[in-house]
Amino acid sequence: MVYLLVFQVHAQTLSEYLEVAAENNPQLQASFHQYLAAVEKVPQVGALPDPQVTFGYFTKPMEMPMGKQRAEITLMQMFPWFGLLRNSKDEASQMANARYQGFLETKNQLFYQIKSTWYEMYKLEEEIRLMEENIAILKSFERLAISRFSSGNSGSTGSTTPRDMSSTQGNIQNQQGGGGMEGMGGSSTSSGNTRSSNSMNTMNGNTMSSGGSMVDVLRVQMEIKELENTIKRLEDSRKPLLTRFNKLLNRPVSETVQVVDTLVAGELPLDRLALLDSVMNNNPMVRMYDFERQAFDTQKEMARREGNPMIGVGVNYMIFSPATNGEQMQMGGENMWMPMVSVTIPLNRKKYNAMKKEAELLGNAAQFEQTAARNQLSIQWDETIRDLDDAARQIKKYQEQITLAGQALRLITTTYSAEGAGFEEVLRVQQQLISYQLNLINTIVDQNEIIARIEMLAAININ
């Protein structure tokens, strides 16, 4: 069998996988490019409107005292009200910052998925390793049970051999025949029946003892088959996990993944109040709504300024050709410059009032969404801390139970080796020990997954 996952002492670290995902994950790249696109909007809204150039040509020159006007060129530049461009740039910058917080949220969720999948892969390999170790232990129990069964069949005391069985059966037949020959002779018949009964009891007891030992062998073989089937089922789970992990990194599914051979119980090195403060203030969703609310406040100010006039400054250049009078004398013909100023008149006040109201309502919505996000984070924080404390208690409990179950198993195994009794209890304690070991692995993985969840909520890297 070719294993898709490998264990190495100097394995590729989880942080290196996170770096690969940060560079290659398409969803994260899409979010980052959305942020870059939002940044490019800042210079767009902060620029002046394009200047306007107008050119007019008279097909029939206009007769004027200063000559014949042939053409006219007008250049005009409009200027928004004071501060409007600055507000536009601020609003675009704040929206870009909100986009960046969305990118950080996507990154944190991606990293959490990668860590969770990586921990699941570790748990899977540990479960397979534990099952293989327990199969080896059960095979040693099988050899012990076979040894007890063999010694029970060949021993002279408390056992039944084929020769003994034949002799006993012959005695029974002889006793039954003697009773029939003697007829009413009660003494001989009674003595024969007593010996026959004793022989039957001895044979049945010895046969049950041998049969019980054989049942022990069959029982342990059943347990081995069950564990072998469990291992095959666990091995079938390797490929889906490997595919999920590699696709999060945007790599081919054939790429191998290395996980640590030992995962220790995690802990929080930081003060919980400091972590809670980070969750409530540094979580990207909370900060995103902060920037959105600031952007809508700026939009409200922009709407107020857009209700003011726009000022235009320009120049008009008129081209003349000389005109002739009645005496055929040329007059005028000099081109003329004319400075110009224009002002827009924002008469539709309803439009600008509606723009201000829209920005105000959107700002209120962002505030409510931020409050809802903080409430949800508070719930998640309490549930996460509860799970973390419970995992710590469970780890301590399972470690103690594994120690006690191991001691009990050694005592029961010693008793069975010496006396041949209590094999069912040996298997029961062994199953308990396996259960405790599996629960310990699962709880350690859960604890590390919980810490990864806290890292996602607080937007920090603890380990």
Residue ranges of model-derived segments:
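Charged, solvent-exposed faces of alpha-helical coiled-coils
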Residues: 27, 34, 41, 88, ...
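Short segments within alpha-helical structural elements
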Residues: 107, 139, 168-177, 183-184, ...
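Periplasmic alpha-helical coiled-coil/stalk elements that build and connect Gram-negative outer-membrane
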Residues: 109-278, 387, 391
